[in-house]
A protein has these predicted regions:
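Sec-dependent N-terminal signal peptides of Gram-positive bacterial secreted proteins and lipoproteins
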Residues: 2-27
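Right-handed parallel beta-helix/beta-solenoid
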Residues: 28-61
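N-terminal segments that cap or nucleate solenoid repeat domains
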Residues: 40-42, 57-77, 402-404
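N-terminal extracellular ligand-recognition/capping segment immediately after the signal peptide
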Residues: 48, 58, 70-114, 138
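Extended beta-solenoid/beta-helix repeat architectures
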Residues: 59, 65-66, 91-93, 364, ...
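Extracellular beta-strand/beta-solenoid scaffold signature
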Residues: 61, 85-88, 109-124, 143-154, ...
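Flexible, charged surface loops at secondary-structure boundaries
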Residues: 65-71, 90-91, 127, 154-155
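Right-handed parallel beta-helix
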Residues: 99-103, 126-140, 158-169, 184-197, ...
Length: 404
């Protein structure tokens, strides 16, 4: 090799050596390098789950989740009825559940199954994220042993999606199908919620709540709480339906679809906000005729949209308040409240359709828009009542038409 060839080879080796000395091995992770999780797809029947409606699958599903905890995991659930005993299934981030048609998670004998979204740290990033349920069916029953139920207990969760899911007779008597505490970016769409046999009639299928142990469907050991409110929830194009018996009468009312009924530490960490309840159908929920209740109830909320929904009574003869918004805090302001373009068919409340109240009438709600609603009824009942003046320039109430 001549002189120039030797020099070029020496120079190249020296440069590579310097680069490796400064940056380390190119195969080793660097301080600012983001490590991608591997993608894994599994079929649950190949991993020990049995869809024979006899075998309990709690341990098998938890084993899958624990074993693949560091993966971007897709879980395919073939057709079958997968039985679950009472207990908890703890999730991790980055899971997609895909259910085949005819695939059902079922529980019975008064058991409650909790899907736990843990939050080992406080703050909006303290929990898990990127969970999708696609086409899932959760089925319970109501027997002499009690109400069997599934609960999604979501604490500081974010980017959680339920699409084309079905929840059948599986709401906790004192709880919820989906329980959101200090969570955000939640998308619930194209799904059906059937039946509610509550011992607390005001409970909602979808609870919008705060990060507080009192609020939880399941108190996961080690979770950290901070009273942060849930925000940015979209509930779109869902159905909330009753169960009828063979004679066509109601055997289980439809769930109250959505709401919130508590606030913690006077809302110092913020209040519930940016909630969208749109294009849904609610049929025959239980009449809530006592003062302070409503089939859709929010306290201390802002940026609320209840729009383009169908509220229908077929077998229920009469309701109480249907939508109830209440400011229970003297100093907090509720603003940007929209109830628009909904239809109310045979609701016939014993009081009014919409009730707005404030614990301090001198602190009314602001930027309220209640317009374009259609009421079909044979009875003359007030559409809106409040305990403060509705003549504020920021309150718009118009084009709410009654049809007999």
């Amino acid at each position: 090799m001549n002189f120039w060839g030797s020099f070029k080879l020496f120079f190249a080796i020296a440069v590579v050596t310097i680069i490796l000395g400064l940056n380390g091995s190119p195969l080793a992770p660097q301080p600012n390098q983001i490590l991608a999780h591997a993608d894994t797809t599994i079929n649950v029947q190949n991993q020990g789950m049995i869809g024979d409606d006899k075998t309990a699958n709690n341990s098998a599903l938890q084993s899958i989740l624990t074993r693949e905890a560091d993966k971007n995991l897709t879980i395919n659930v073939p057709k079958g009825v997968y039985l679950f005993d009472a207990g908890c299934i703890k999730l991790h981030s980055n899971i997609t559940f895909n259910f085949d048609k005819g695939a059902t998670f079922r529980t019975t004998l008064g058991n409650q199954v909790n899907f736990v979204y843990p939050s080992p740290k406080a703050g909006y990033n303290g929990g898990i994220s990127n969970i999708k349920w696609q086409g899932a069916t959760f089925q319970g029953d109501n027997t002499p042993s009690g109400q069997s139920c599934f609960a999604q207990s979501i604490h500081h969760g974010k980017k959680i999606e339920f699409n084309k899911c079905t929840f059948i007779n599986a709401e906790s008597p004192g709880g919820h199908y989906i329980d959101l505490e200090g969570s955000h970016n939640i998308d619930i769409k194209n799904s059906t919620f059937i039946g509610f046999n509550g011992n607390m009639d005001f409970k909602e299928a979808i609870q919008i709540d705060y990060s507080n142990p009192v609020a939880m469907s399941y108190k996961n050991p080690g979770d950290q709480y901070d009273n942060l409110p849930t925000y940015n929830v979209k509930v779109n194009n869902n159905r909330f339906l009753p169960i009828y018996n063979s004679a066509g009468q109601i055997s289980s009312y439809a769930p109250n679809p959505i709401g919130e009924h508590a606030i913690y530490n006077n809302g110092k960490a913020g209040i519930i906000h940016d909630i969208h309840f749109t294009n849904n159908t609610v049929v025959d929920p239980k009449p809530l005729t006592t003062y302070g209740n409503g089939n859709i109830r929010f306290i201390d909320v802002s940026n609320l949209w209840i729009t383009n929904n169908k509220f229908i009574n077929k077998k229920v003869p009469r309701s109480g308040n249907y939508i109830y918004l209440n400011n229970v805090e003297q100093k907090l302001k509720m603003t940007n409240l929209n109830i628009k373009n909904n239809s109310f068919t045979n609701i016939d409340p014993n009081t009014q359709y919409i009730f707005l109240t404030s614990s301090n009438p001198r602190n009314p709600m602001h930027h309220v828009n209640i317009t374009g609603n259609k009421i079909t009824s044979q009875k003359n009942v007030s559409f809106i009542k409040s305990n403060f003046s509705l003549k504020s320039p920021t309150i718009k109430i118009s084009k709410n038409n009654a049809v007999k």
